[in-house]
Amino acid sequence: MKSSLLVYALFLVITFLFYSSAGTAGTLLNVSYDPTRELYQEVNTAFAKFWKEKTGQEVTIQASHGGSGKQARAVIDGLDADVVTLALAYDINAISEKSGLLPKNWQKQFPDNSTPYTSTIVFLVRKGNPKHIRDWDDLVKDGISIITPNPKTSGGARWNYLAAWGFALKKYGSEGKAREFVSKLYRNVPVLDVGARGSTITFVQRNIGDVLIAWENEALLSLKELGKEKVEIVVPSVSILAEPPVAVVDKIAERHGTTKIAKAYLEFLYTAEGQEIAARNFYRPRLPDVAAKYAGQFPKVALFTIDEVFGGWQKTQAGHFSDGGVFDEIYKGIR
């Protein structure tokens, strides 16, 4: 009798575990950068529906947002991210190098160097553009108040800095002149927020500053929410191609048993549906058909890449943004 009861109890446990695993794929944590909240709210809902229809399993996707550099540090320090979707490749490189949680060749996991969408850097100004800001040169004039986040913590801020440096390098022809230009720009910055969304709040809600140097997607979102009666977008003559990458954090996903779902989640970003969601949230899609559909949404701008002008992220981070680097020297000299 006892043996029969034991067999029956074991049968119930196995049955429960079978149906539990068939009904849920568990929980994913996406550690992302600051202004992607709206994007991933929509992606997460769409992917959960897609996965349920495909597998019958329910999945819960949680998200953490903040300055890209801070988010990378949090993962290195123990935040259990199944996937990371950060502002720039260096931050994921740092996770790989300092924690060993994903391989050094992580950018080979997905197409386009694991960058499913792109963006660039533009200016957001107040209605009527009262300070007549047209290009980067206008930002270094006396009396201009610029809002941009801190490059030590924010990925978007690093793109802002590099866009300004690249403009000056192309126009004035030397690293010395570019450094002088960027120094003048930061003299006009009254406050450095931790992340890009914080800077948007400073400019839009706290009404500080004449111009916000911003992710294109963040500027377009602000224009959509506030309307032309509040803000306008100014597209500079030249800017940088910003490529925010994605990666599965392999060792954490393996430990959680979420590797399959984590990979599928990031692959979803490359599908027609995922690309449509990116475009609706003002990120430039990679898929040609979707890019053509939304071409009118994105202004034409001459773009350079970090590899072309700066030699890639490893060199750029070490020279400009590491402790004691060029940014620290510039900021120390003006404060």
Regions found by a protein language model. Give the residues of each.
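Bacterial N-terminal signal peptides
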Residues: 8-19
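N-terminal segment of the mature folded domain
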Residues: 25-153, 302, 331
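Sec/Tat signal peptide C-region and signal peptidase I cleavage site
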Residues: 19-25
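Extracellular/periplasmic juxtamembrane helices and adjacent flexible linkers that interface
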Residues: 253-335
